[in-house]
């Protein structure tokens, strides 16, 4: 079966839709949260069960060198994200050790403002690690390889929920949402190249135990800190809105 579309397809469920916030407000919130000062956290720093997840999509029907796939993925990384999840800036703009701000859709129509840190990048792959406050502690490796003339794009991650609160969220549907997030991302990546393909997913629990010594990570919980920062900003934003409306009435 030829999986190629008749013409290049633009993903319809990508990171393109507006998150509902102006970029300036997003970066202001990131500064208030001190996102750029948060240290990276590996799987050993988290609280919850340890999971290895591998998502793959076979790009059948197109001659795509792995280097081209990764170069495209780096340039348009956030554009392949589903829903209103946002990644601010291409991977190509980051140097190893630098953080990119991200907004992640959460239950109850809320948004988690956090980030990811670039660890390394090569022509055929790149690795990100989560900072303190992120819902997960661990790393994610994005790669492309070729076997028997078929190029495969992959996301492999080794992760734990960072604290007890986020672990509860992952158990109550968070893992399902995250798996679908990366599957849809790979569908969108394939569609960018005009290929309709269904990803494969393999999930393995590497360690079923909780790391109770890291329960204190809840102090850095990004959802709690996001809520406090947004609550503190309400009076100023209400004042700004009032001034704008007064200015509109007098103009």
Model-flagged regions — what are they?
Residues 107-148:
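Hydrophobic-ligand binding "helix-grip"
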Residues 104-107, 131-133, 157-161, 217:
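Secondary-structure transition/turn motif
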Residues 161-207:
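A conserved amphipathic terminal alpha-helix motif
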Residues 71-79, 133, 149, 187, ...:
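Short, intrinsically disordered, mixed-charge
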Residues 133-177:
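Beta-strand/loop substructures that line and gate deep hydrophobic ligand-binding cavities in soluble
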